[in-house]
């Protein structure tokens, strides 16, 4: 129960931060038009969709609380790659971002393995601070 509350807080922090930056959340969950149909998790990790002026983004929110951070990274990279390809087919004008908490950025993404992942997988990242309830850094490739 405590973990679910933490995960919900992470999700809300990202939504609130995007709205504070002028984004309009258009979908709290995103369903891909695929066979079989894929949709994002209803609990911990969610994909949200937002628009600002002419920009459109989809954001896969990760907590990096559930497993080892290396295992979380591997899972996140697999989802990111699949979601990005599906999004290119479904809505090519929408950019996919992976939102990660500050602790995950510092422990994984700012280090060698994370930097390689950012480069090889062409990750677009939003680093968010749960305590301050705001995005700290946008990394665009």
Regions from the PLM with identified roles:
Residues 85-121, 128-130:
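Nucleic-acid nuclease catalytic cores
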Residues 43, 62, 131:
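Anionic group-transfer/hydrolysis microenvironments
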Residues 124-141:
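Charged phosphate-binding loop/patch that engages nucleotide di/tri-phosphates or the phosphate backbone
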Residues 23-58, 72, 140-141:
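Active-site metal-binding core of divalent-cation-utilizing nuclease and nuclease-like domains
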Residues 70-93:
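Basic, amphipathic alpha-helical patches used to engage nucleic acids or provide basic targeting signals
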Residues 2-11, 15:
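Nuclease catalytic cores
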């Amino acid at each position: 129960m405590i973990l679910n509350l933490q995960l919900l807080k992470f999700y809300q922090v990202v939504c609130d931060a995007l709205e504070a930056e002028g984004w309009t959340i258009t979908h709290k969950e995103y369903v891909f038009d695929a066979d079989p149909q894929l949709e994002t998790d209803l609990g911990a990790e969610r994909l949200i969709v937002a628009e600002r002026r002419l920009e459109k983004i989809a954001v896969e929110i990760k907590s990096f609380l559930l497993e080892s951070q290396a295992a979380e990274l591997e899972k996140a990279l697999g989802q990111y790659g699949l979601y990005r390809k599906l999004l290119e087919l479904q809505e090519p004008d929408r950019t996919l971002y992976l939102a990660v908490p500050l602790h995950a950025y510092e422990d994984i993404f700012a280090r060698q393995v994370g930097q390689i992942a950012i480069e090889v997988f062409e990750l677009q990242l939003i680093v968010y601070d749960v305590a301050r309830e705001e995005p700290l850094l946008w990394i665009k490739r």
